Amino acid sequence: MAVQQNKKSPSKRGMHRSHDALTAPALSVDSTTGEVHRPHHISPNGMYRGRKVVKAKGE
């Protein structure tokens, strides 16, 4: 088991944890359908950047 050499100060501990905060996922709106999707991903209906690229389920 690893044992620390020196105690980490509260300041250094806080600096270490500074990038641990959760962020909300970025969302884009499709210009054609107005549907919300993740950037650089196709929307649920199979559209990407105004073009139909994949057949949606049930089509």
Swiss-Prot record:
SUPFAM superfamilies: Zn-binding ribosomal proteins. GO terms for biological process: translation. Transmembrane segments: none annotated. InterPro entries: Ribosomal_bL32, Ribosomal_bL32_bact, Ribosomal_zn-bd. It comes from the Bacteria. Keywords: Ribonucleoprotein, Ribosomal protein. GO terms for cellular component: cytosolic large ribosomal subunit. Residues 1-59 are annotated as: Disordered. Residues 49-59 have a biased composition (Basic residues). NCBIfam families: rpmF_bact. Belongs to the bacterial ribosomal protein bL32 family. HAMAP family: Ribosomal_bL32. This is Large ribosomal subunit protein bL32.
